[in-house]
C-alpha cells in the first residue's frame, strides 16, 4: 500500500463504516481492514491519518485501530511470519513518541498504550533511544507534553510491580533509574513549587495534580522490586513532600461529585500506597519517617467522609495501617488498649457498615457486587481494608481485639433483634465483623484454612445464620440471606458436616430467590460444598446423601437460568456441571429433558458468545451428560448426536470461533463412544477438518488433533478405502504442525495415530518422506520436546513395523544413518522421555532393536548393542533427565500469537490415556528378560559374553534381577 492520498481516502471511508451500528455495513468494513493490515505502510497510513485528518472522530478511530493493530501484530512469534515489515517497525518507533505528545489527550492515551506494547517487546534492546527522547521532553515546560511522557512511562514501568526477579529485569531497571530517576525527582520538586505558585488557579492545579499522581505512581513502580540507591539517598526529598501533600487541603481541588474520586483523593491514595510499600519492604530505612505518616494517615481516616468518592483513599489508608501493624518493628505503636479501642471504634466499625451505595450496587449492579464480594476484586473497598486491618491487629493482639469486637457484635445483634426490618444493617455488620475476626487465612478454593480459635463459629452459625436461611420467604432480607450463604461458603471447613447437610436443601430453595446476588451465592455455595473432600480423599458429600434432593436441585438450577439477569450466570452453570459430576448415574432419568435445555442454551449463546466461563461450564455439563449416560448405555450416543449436531453445524457454518474448539472436543467424545466403524455423518465432516484455514487458529489445534485421532482410532480402514485421497491432506497437517516448536508435539500425536491405526499399505508410499521431514526439523531446530516426541515415535514405528524395517528405512535415507541415530539420539537422550506410557513404548521398541534386529548382532552396529542395553536399563532405573539446554530455557511454547482464541481443555471431555502396547506387554522389564533369553537361545554364548564384558556392574546387577523375576537365564 502506497502512502498516497487515494489510500488515505479509502482508509478514511472504511474506518467510518466500522463505526456504523448496522452489522451489514460494519462487518464488511472490519473484514476489509483485516485483509489489508498485512500490507507494508498500513500502520503508517493510520498514523498519517492521525496527523492530517480534519475529522476528530476519524482521528480517534484511527488511533484505536492502530493500538489494536499493534496489540495483535507487534510481537514476533517464533515459527510464525513477521506480521509487520522491518521498515514499518523502524518508522513507527521513529515517529510515534512525537505524534503521541502532540495529540489531544483522547488520542494520546491510545498512542501511549501502543508505545507501552511496543516497549514491552523492544525496550531497551531494540529501542534504546526511547528513554532519552522521553526525558528530553521534561524540559519543554508544557505539562500536556510532560503528562503524555509520564503516562507512557507509567504504562511501561508498571510491569516492574509484578515481574519475577531476574538479571535481565535488574539490568533494565538500572538502565531506567540511571536515565529517569534524577529528572523525575527534579520534575517532582518543580511541580510542587508550581503548585504553591498557582495555589489559587484551579485549572493549573488540575494539570499539576495530574502530574503529581503519575509521578507518585512511577515512584511506586521504580521502588517496588528493591530500594534503589538513588531513592534511598533522596528519601528526605520524596518523603517530606509526600507528607506535605498528604496533609494538604485545597478547596479548589474538592469536587461536588459524591461518586467519582477527585485528583486530591487519587494523589493521597497513591501516597498511602507508597508509604505502605516502604513500611513493608524497607522498614529500617523508613523508620524515622513512619510516625509522621501514621499520624497523618490516622487524621485522614477520622476526618474523611463516608461518600463513595473517598473509598479508594480510605481503603488505601487503612491498608497502610494494616501493613504497619503486622510488622514486629512497629508493634509498640498499637499495644496500648486505648489505641486498639480507638482503632476499632473510629476506623474499623464505621468502615464495615453497609452503606446506601452498597445497597444500590447489591440491587442494581449485582454483577459488579458479586465480582467484588466473591471473586476478591474488592481490594479497594473500605470493608476489605477494614477486614485486613482486623487480621493485621490479630497477629499480635488477638485476645484484646477479639474481646473488643465481641462487645460490638453483641450490641449490633441486640439492635437488630429490637426491630429487624429497620435494623438489618446492624446484623450485616455483625456477620462481617465475625467473619473478619475469625478468618486468619483464606483461599478461594478452600475457604478459611486457619481460624481464630476464640470465635465459636458453629454456635454463631446455628444461632444467627441458620434462622435467616430457614425462613420460608426466600426474598425477605436479601442482603442477610446473601451474608448467611457466604458464611457457609467461607467457613465450610469449620462448620460440622451435619450442619452443612442441613444447609443443602435451604441453599436449593434459595436458587429461586429473585435477588441475583442471593441465587448466585446459593449456586456458588452448592458448587463449593460439592467439591469438598472427606478424610479418604473422596467427596465429602456422597451422591446417596444428595439423592433426596436431586429433582428439586436440577429443577431449581435450570430454573435459575431463566431468572432476570441470570440467563448466562457462570456460577449457576458451574453448579450444574458440579451437580452432574457428583450425582453421576442419578441424573440419567433427567438427561433427555436437561440436554434439550442445554442445547437450547447453547444455540442462544452461540449467536453472541460473551461469557467465556459460562460457555466453558456449559460444554463441560454437555460432556458429563454424554459420559454418564453412555457409560450406562453406549447406544444412547445416537440421541446426543441428534440433539447436538444441528447446533454444531450452525456453529461451524457461522464460524463461531470461541466455540469451535469446544465443538471438536465434544465430537471427539461422541466419536470415541462408538465402538465399531465411523458413522457416515462423521465421514462427511472428515475432509473439512483438513482445510488449512481451520489449522491457522492456534486455539483449534489440540481439539482438531484429538478429533482426527478419534477418526483414525475408530475408522482407519474406512479412511484407507473411502477417503484414501485425503491421506496426503492428513500428512500435510502433520507437516505443518511438525514445523512449529509450539505445536510439534501435536504433530507427533497425529503421526503416532496414523502409524498405529492406518493399514500399512495405505501409508507405505509416504513413510520415507515422513522420516525425511523429521530429520530436516532435527537438523534445523532440535529441542528437548521434539527429541522426546521423536524417540516415542521411532519406537512406536519399531513396534508396529518391526526393528528391521526401522533400520532399513534409516539406512535407505542415508547409509549408516541407523547407527548415527542410535549413537547420537537414542542412547544419549532416552533418559529424557517422561510419562509411563511413553517410557513403556520406548522400552518395548528398544527391546525389539536389541533382540529382533539381525544387523545389531553381526555388523558394525554390534558395537552399539551394549550401550543401547545400558541406556534401556537406565530408562528403567535412573531418575528422569529433566535438564534443559541453556538456549532452550527461555522458549515459551505456550505463547498464543496475537489475540486468537486460546484453546480451553474440557476436563470432562478428557481422553483416557491410550497404551498401544498394553495388550502385548504388561511388564517391560520382564519382557526385556524374556526377549534376551530368546535371543541367547538363537545365538548361544554371545549374549552373556557381550553383557558381562561391556555392561557396567550396576546395570548388570539390575539385569540379573529382571532375569530372575522372569525365571529365565542367558544361554
From Swiss-Prot:
Protein name: Exportin-2
Quaternary structure (record): Found in a complex with CSE1L/XPO2, Ran and KPNA2. Binds with high affinity to importin-alpha only in the presence of RanGTP. The complex is dissociated by the combined action of RanBP1 and RanGAP1. Interacts with CFTR.
GO molecular function: small GTPase binding
Tissue: Ubiquitous. Detected in embryos from 5 to 17 dpc. Highly expressed in adult testis, heart, brain, lung, liver, skeletal muscle, spleen and kidney.
Organism from which the protein derives: Mus musculus (Mouse)
Superkingdom assignment: Eukaryota
Positions of modified residues (N-acetylmethionine): 1
Function of the molecule: Export receptor for importin-alpha. Mediates importin-alpha re-export from the nucleus to the cytoplasm after import substrates (cargos) have been released into the nucleoplasm. In the nucleus binds cooperatively to importin-alpha and to the GTPase Ran in its active GTP-bound form. Docking of this trimeric complex to the nuclear pore complex (NPC) is mediated through binding to nucleoporins.
GO cellular component assignments: cytosol; nucleoplasm
UniProt KW DNA damage keyword: no
Entry keyword annotation includes Iron: no
Importin N-terminal domain sequence ranges: 29-102
Effect of inactivating the gene: Complete embryonic lethality at around 5.5 dpc.
Gene Ontology BP terms: intracellular protein transport; nucleocytoplasmic transport
Record SUPFAM superfamilies: ARM repeat
Amino acid at each position: 500500500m502506497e502512502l498516497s492520498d487515494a489510500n488515505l481516502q479509502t482508509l478514511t471511508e472504511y474506518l467510518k463504516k466500522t463505526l456504523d451500528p448496522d452489522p451489514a455495513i460494519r462487518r464488511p468494513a472490519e473484514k476489509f481492514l483485516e485483509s489489508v493490515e498485512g500490507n507494508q505502510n498500513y500502520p503508517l497510513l493510520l498514523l498519517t491519518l492521525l496527523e492530517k485528518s480534519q475529522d476528530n472522530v476519524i482521528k480517534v478511530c484511527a488511533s484505536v485501530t492502530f493500538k489494536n493493530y499493534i496489540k495483535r501484530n507487534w510481537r514476533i512469534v517464533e515459527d510464525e511470519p513477521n506480521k509487520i515489515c522491518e521498515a514499518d517497525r523502524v518508522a513507527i518507533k521513529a515517529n510515534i513518541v512525537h505524534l503521541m505528545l502532540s495529540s489531544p489527550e483522547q488520542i494520546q492515551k491510545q498512542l501511549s498504550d501502543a508505545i507501552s506494547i511496543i516497549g514491552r517487546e523492544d525496550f531497551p534492546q531494540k529501542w534504546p533511544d526511547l528513554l532519552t527522547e522521553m526525558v528530553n521532553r521534561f524540559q519543554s515546560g508544557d505539562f500536556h507534553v510532560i503528562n503524555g511522557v509520564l503516562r507512557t512511562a507509567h504504562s511501561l514501568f508498571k510491569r516492574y510491580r509484578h515481574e519475577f526477579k531476574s538479571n535481565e529485569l535488574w539490568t533494565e531497571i538500572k538502565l531506567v533509574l540511571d536515565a529517569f530517576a534524577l529528572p523525575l525527582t527534579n520534575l517532582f520538586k518543580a511541580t510542587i513549587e508550581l503548585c504553591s505558585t498557582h495555589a489559587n488557579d484551579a485549572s493549573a492545579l488540575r494539570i499539576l495534580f495530574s502530574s503529581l499522581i503519575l509521578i507518585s505512581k512511577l515512584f511506586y513502580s521504580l521502588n517496588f522490586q528493591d530500594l534503589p540507591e538513588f531513592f534511598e539517598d533522596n528519601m528526605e526529598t520524596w518523603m517530606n513532600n509526600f507528607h506535605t501533600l498528604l496533609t494538604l487541603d485545597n478547596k479548589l481541588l474538592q469536587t461536588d461529585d459524591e461518586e467519582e474520586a477527585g485528583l486530591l483523593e487519587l494523589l493521597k491514595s497513591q501516597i498511602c500506597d507508597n508509604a505502605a510499600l516502604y513500611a513493608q519492604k524497607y522498614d529500617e530505612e523508613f523508620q524515622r519517617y513512619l510516625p509522621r505518616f501514621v499520624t497523618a494517615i490516622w487524621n485522614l481516616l477520622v476526618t474523611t467522609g463516608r461518600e463513595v468518592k473517598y473509598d479508594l483513599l480510605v481503603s488505601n489508608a487503612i491498608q497502610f495501617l494494616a501493613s504497619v501493624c503486622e510488622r514486629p518493628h512497629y508493634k509498640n505503636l498499637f499495644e496500648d488498649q486505648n489505641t486498639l479501642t480507638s482503632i476499632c471504634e473510629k476506623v474499623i466499625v464505621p468502615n464495615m457498615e453497609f452503606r446506601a451505595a452498597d445497597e444500590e450496587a447489591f440491587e442494581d449492579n449485582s454483577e459488579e457486587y458479586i465480582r467484588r464480594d466473591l471473586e476478591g476484586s474488592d481490594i479497594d473497598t473500605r470493608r476489605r481494608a477494614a477486614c485486613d486491618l482486623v487480621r493485621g491487629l490479630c497477629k499480635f493482639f488477638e485476645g484484646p481485639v477479639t474481646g473488643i469486637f465481641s462487645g460490638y457484635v453483641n450490641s449490633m445483634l441486640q439492635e437488630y433483634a429490637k426491630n429487624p426490618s429497620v435494623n438489618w444493617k446492624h446484623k450485616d455488620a455483625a456477620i462481617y465483623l465475625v467473619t473478619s475476626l475469625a478468618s486468619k487465612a483464606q483461599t478461594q478454593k478452600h475457604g478459611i484454612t486457619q481460624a481464630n480459635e476464640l470465635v465459636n463459629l458453629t454456635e454463631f452459625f446455628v444461632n444467627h445464620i441458620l434462622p435467616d436461611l430457614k425462613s420460608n420467604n426466600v426474598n425477605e432480607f436479601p442482603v442477610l440471606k446473601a451474608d448467611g450463604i457466604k458464611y457457609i461458603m467461607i467457613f465450610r471447613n469449620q462448620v460440622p458436616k451435619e450442619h452443612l447437610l442441613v444447609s443443602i436443601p435451604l441453599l436449593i430453595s434459595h436458587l429461586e430467590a429473585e435477588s441475583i446476588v442471593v441465587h448466585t451465592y446459593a449456586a456458588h455455595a452448592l458448587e463449593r460444598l460439592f467439591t469438598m473432600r472427606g478424610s479418604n480423599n473422596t467427596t465429602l458429600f456422597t451422591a446417596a446423601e444428595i439423592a433426596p434432593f436431586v429433582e428439586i436441585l436440577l429443577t431449581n438450577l435450570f430454573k435459575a437460568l431463566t431468572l432476570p439477569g441470570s440467563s448466562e450466570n457462570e456460577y449457576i452453570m458451574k453448579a450444574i456441571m458440579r451437580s452432574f459430576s457428583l450425582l453421576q448415574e442419578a441424573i440419567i432419568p433427567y438427561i433427555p429433558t436437561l440436554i434439550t435445555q442445554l442445547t437450547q442454551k447453547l444455540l442462544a449463546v452461540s449467536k453472541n458468545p460473551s461469557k467465556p466461563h459460562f460457555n466453558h461450564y456449559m460444554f463441560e455439563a454437555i460432556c458429563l451428560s454424554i459420559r454418564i449416560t453412555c457409560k450406562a448405555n453406549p447406544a444412547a450416543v445416537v440421541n446426543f448426536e441428534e440433539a447436538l449436531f444441528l447446533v454444531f453445524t450452525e456453529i461451524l457454518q457461522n464460524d463461531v470461533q470461541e466455540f469451535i474448539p469446544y465443538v471438536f472436543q465434544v465430537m471427539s467424545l461422541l466419536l470415541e463412544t462408538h465402538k465399531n466403524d465411523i458413522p457416515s455423518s462423521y465421514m462427511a465432516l472428515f475432509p473439512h477438518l483438513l482445510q488449512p484455514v481451520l489449522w491457522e487458529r492456534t486455539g483449534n489445534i489440540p481439539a482438531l488433533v484429538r478429533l482426527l485421532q478419534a477418526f483414525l482410532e475408530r475408522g482407519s480402514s474406512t479412511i484407507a478405502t473411502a477417503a484414501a485421497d485425503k491421506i496426503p491432506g492428513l500428512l500435510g497437517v502433520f507437516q505443518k504442525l511438525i514445523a512449529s516448536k509450539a505445536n510439534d508435539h501435536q504433530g507427533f500425536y497425529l503421526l503416532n495415530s496414523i502409524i498405529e491405526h492406518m493399514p500399512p499399505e495405505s501409508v507405505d508410499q509416504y513413510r520415507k518422506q515422513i522420516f525425511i521431514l523429521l530429520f530436516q526439523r532435527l537438523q534445523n531446530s532440535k529441542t528437548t520436546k521434539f527429541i522426546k516426541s521423536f524417540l516415542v515415535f521411532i519406537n512406536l514405528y519399531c513396534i508396529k513395523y518391526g526393528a528391521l524395517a526401522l533400520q532399513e528405512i534409516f539406512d535407505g535415507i542415508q547409509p549408516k544413518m541407523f547407527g548415527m541415530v542410535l549413537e547420537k539420539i537414542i542412547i544419549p537422550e532416552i533418559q529424557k522421555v517422561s510419562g509411563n506410557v511413553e517410557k513403556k513404548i520406548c522400552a518395548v521398541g528398544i527391546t525389539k532393536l536389541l533382540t529382533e534386529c539381525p544387523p545389531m548382532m553381526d555388523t558394525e552396529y554390534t558395537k552399539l548393542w551394549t550401550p543401547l542395553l545400558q541406556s534401556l536399563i537406565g530408562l528403567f532405573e535412573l531418575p528422569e533427565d529433566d535438564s534443559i539446554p541453556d538456549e532452550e530455557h527461555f522458549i515459551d511454547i505456550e505463547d498464543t500469537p496475537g489475540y486468537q482464541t486460546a484453546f480451553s481443555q474440557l476436563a470432562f471431555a478428557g481422553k483416557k490415556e491410550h497404551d498401544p502396547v498394553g495388550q502385548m506387554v504388561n511388564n517391560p522389564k520382564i519382557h526385556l528378560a524374556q526377549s534376551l533369553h530368546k535371543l541367547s537361545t538363537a545365538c548361544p554364548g554371545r549374549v552373556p559374553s557381550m553383557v558381562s564384558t561391556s555392561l557396567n556392574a550396576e546395570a548388570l546387577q539390575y539385569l540379573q534381577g529382571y532375569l530372575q523375576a522372569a525365571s529365565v537365564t542367558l544361554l
